[in-house]
Amino acid sequence: MAERVLATLETGRFAPHGPPRKPSYRVVAWNLERGIEYEGQLEAFRTHPYLRSGDLYLVTETDVGMARSGNRNIARDLARNLGLDYAFAPCYLNLSKGAGVESEASGENEIGLHGNAILSRYPIRNARPIPIGNGRDKMRGREKRLGQQVAVAADIGLPGLDLTVCSVHLDAQSKQNHRRDQMQAILDGLPAAGPAVIGGDWNTTTFDSSSATAAIIGYWVRVMLGPGNTIRKHFLRPYTYFERKLFRLLESRGFNWRDANLLDERTTSYDVEDAKTHKNLREWVPAWCFDFIRWALREFDGKCPLKIDWFAVRGATPAAPVVIHEFREGRKPPLSDHDAIGIDLRPDGRSQI
């Protein structure tokens, strides 16, 4: 039964028919952190000048029937309220309410699904899941789950641009090589040629996070490299060394990521004084580590920026990449632990239909 549920794609149509042809199409990717702050996220999609002008939304970490997110169907509820078509691919059937502060959510899970989605103003065709495997046994630890990470891909009939899109969340609890292998599985599941965009949370932290021990060893390696040097040359530029295989793989398949992203710009941050982050990490990182983390980040106000959300584009011209910090930074509570990212896509001569 669980396997059948996890293999079932959910789709719905709420968009008006016949949206117009445009000189460029706006794509937004945002990790919604389960949809815990759904009401604020919906308001942002409705009213923020950039978000409300999107044509395609690649949303990751969306719940269905989880207590932590009000037992909503996050992707469907967003699509209905925003007048969009949607496709949702479940990744996990959760056997608990979550980890860290999520375990304290009131009520119980009514369904317990979690996954990734595509929302679109234009018709979604041939939506399909792309299983990409786990980097760690999800039955270990407090948040016990059945299933595996799954990307969701679809063909979108944009006027003037026949585009394949893929909403991606690479496994946070994984090695660098496993993230590269997950991206290869995604690329193997997409057409070998033609216009395409891959977007989402790639978790390019530079760390081997498959275990607490590996993460702690990696932390000390980065301390020896120097915190400032590590932040500038690795955390904000993961493609330079630790995650280079993933980015080179994309280039070998004809995908352009350099022009599709605002380089050197953070999309999330670790704040050593954030109580929620501290509680979540405390479940698998020993308490003594936090004093050393504070020491390493003492010159950076206890904050460590990371660039882990990305686009890669093939067969279309990327333009004007953005990172929107205001939903996360300086907002209590933040709408998500990730920034939204965006890009405009212009058809090139080969992509006309």
Regions found by a protein language model. Name each.
Residues 1-113, 346-353:
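N-terminal, active-site-proximal structural segment of metallo-dependent hydrolase catalytic domains
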Residues 1-13, 129, 190-197, 204-353:
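Metal-dependent phosphoester-hydrolase catalytic domains
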Residues 14-27, 112, 116, 120-126, ...:
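Beta-strand-turn-beta hairpins that frame and shape the catalytic cleft
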Residues 26-32, 45-71, 91, 119, ...:
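Active-site beta-strand/loop signature of hydrolases that rely on acidic residues for catalysis
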Residues 35-37, 64-67, 94-97, 137, ...:
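Active-site environment of divalent metal-dependent phosphoester hydrolases
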Residues 37-40, 70, 111, 145-148, ...:
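Soluble or luminal CAZymes and related metallo-dependent hydrolases
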Residues 40-42, 70-72, 98-102, 131, ...:
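Short aromatic-enriched loop/helix-cap "lid" or pocket-rim segments at secondary-structure transitions
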Residues 62-63, 133-143, 168-176, 233-234:
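Surface-exposed cleft-lining segments at the edges of enzyme active sites
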